[in-house]
Curated annotation (Swiss-Prot):
Belongs to the universal ribosomal protein uS14 family. Zinc-binding uS14 subfamily. Zn(2+) binds at residues 24, 27, 40, 43. Part of the 30S ribosomal subunit. Contacts proteins S3 and S10. PROSITE patterns: RIBOSOMAL_S14 (PS00527). Binds 1 zinc ion per subunit. One of its GO terms (biological process) is translation. NCBIfam families: PRK08061.1. This is Small ribosomal subunit protein uS14. Transmembrane segments: none annotated. Its cofactor is Zn(2+).
């Protein structure tokens, strides 16, 4: 979980564009971010496993 101060810091408008950091919309995690979904890999796995993301299925071959 991201700290409250880190989340508040990222909400403020940044002076430079390179300082912007993508964060998970659900938990605020800065790493393992999937742009297509806007969430981190851990939250993506949880939601996909529960069938809450349309079109995402467990692979099997």
């Amino acid at each position: 979980m991201a700290t409250t101060s880190a989340e508040a810091k990222m909400r403020k408008p940044q002076k430079f564009a390179t300082r912007y950091r993508n964060r998970c919309r659900l938990c605020g995690r800065p790493r393992g971010y999937y742009r297509d979904f806007g969430i981190c890999r851990i939250c993506l796995r949880k939601l996909a496993y529960n069938g809450e993301i349309p079109g995402v299925t467990k692979s099997s071959w």
